[in-house]
Amino acid sequence: MDYVIGGGLAAFIIYAAKKWNKTEKEKIQHTFQNIGYVVKDKEPKLFKTHKSTTHTLYTYHVPYGLVDDPKLEVLEKVLNKPVKVSFANGKLHIKVYHSKLNNNYSYDSFESKGKWIVPIGKTYDGSVYHDFDDIPHMIVAGSTTWGKTVFLRMLMTHLIENNPNGVEFYILDLKGRLAFNRYRNLKQVKAIAGDYKESANALKKVKKSIDKDMDYLRSIDAENAKEANIPTRKFIIIDEAGELKPDKSMSDEDKEYTKKCQQILNHIARVAGQIGYKMIYGTQYPTKEILDPQIKANALARVSFRLATSVQSGVAVDQPGAEKLECKGRAIYKTVDDYIVQTPFISKKEIWERIGRYENDPSSKEDQKTRKNTVHFG
Ligand SMILES: Nc1ncnc2c1ncn2[C@@H]1O[C@H](COP(=O)(O)OP(=O)(O)OP(=O)(O)O)[C@@H](O)[C@H]1O
Ligand SMILES: [Mg+2]
């Protein structure tokens, strides 16, 4: 008698796989029961399934009283795929993405979309960009080494490449001027400050420039930079705003400088956005003391890399989640909507290949003229 070894076993494996490998739809339905996302014996009923290249969208009729519940976050672990749950038009929508985000997307995989539009990152649905002419001020939060400085440098590189003659930077590089020192030689960088006194001086220059621009706008009866056809945009970048918090160890003089800085930064946040001044406020410590309410209320774009606690996440992006971000460069980008993004990675080498030609470029006449007015502190 001949035996075919394995034949019966193969049939059993296929049978068992069918039995135990439940479909996504079945797993979701079981999860509803197991976590008690039901009303008495009534549970959500699948109403429509829509498949696309990036995701499958399941839409459910739910019993009255059920909405998008944080309990449903477990679906991400149950399905081992990224899941977005929302509740709209009386229905529950569960979007299950086919794959997770990569841990690295190179900067050159993003397009150039316009003068003041910068790439923010890849989401599950594609790339996301930010328009600084729509939303002028941005807070960039994140604990140490999760990606703030790479992100700030990437923004600068993009803005310089797109507007070599129309963008200006004032940089407060408050961790000893280590992150942006080389940028001082760029023609677009008008001031770079590494301590309190230099920061106060740099911001006083910005304040003077704002006053002048305001006078000009009033004289032509224009309300904003676009209406007045002002081509230049001025970016004030703060890399570690936490350093500007006055504390007991500071000299009285330094306390005064930090107060002056805070005062001018508040002024920029409140009045200067629409006249062409954009503030990018970076901090490791998003606490109520460091994120002044005026600045928070006016910085309507937020980018948060990983933070230590959900409380910090609440301060930075008004919602928990930043404490759970998994890898370097991963962030929550929030304006009206919020997205999980993997921000573009750019190396120092690539940055200087792209913008190195604007370092100490004495060949252009316009360049020489601007550089005369350029103030380098320290
Ligand atoms: N978008 C990104 N994609 C992949 N890796 C990244 C990304 N951004 C940063 N990294 C990695 O994380 C490291 C630290 O990043 P970065 O210097 O920007 O941190 P940081 O938040 O500024 O830290 P600190 O607060 O200490 O200054 C980088 O050297 C790089 O290896
Ligand atoms: Mg840094």
Where do the language-model regions lie?
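P-loop NTPase catalytic phosphate-binding loop
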Residues: 1-23, 57, 103, 107-219, ...
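N-terminal "pre-motor" subdomain/linker immediately upstream of P-loop NTPase catalytic cores
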Residues: 5-6, 10, 15-112, 116-121, ...
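Short, glycine/acidic-rich hinge or "gate" loops at secondary-structure transitions
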Residues: 218-227
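Short basic/glycine-enriched coil/helix segment immediately N-terminal to the Walker B
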Residues: 226-234
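Surface-exposed substrate-engagement region within the catalytic domains
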Residues: 312
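Conserved C-terminal "switch" segment of AAA+ ATPases
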Residues: 320-336
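Extracellular glycan-recognition surfaces and repeat-rich motifs
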Residues: 341
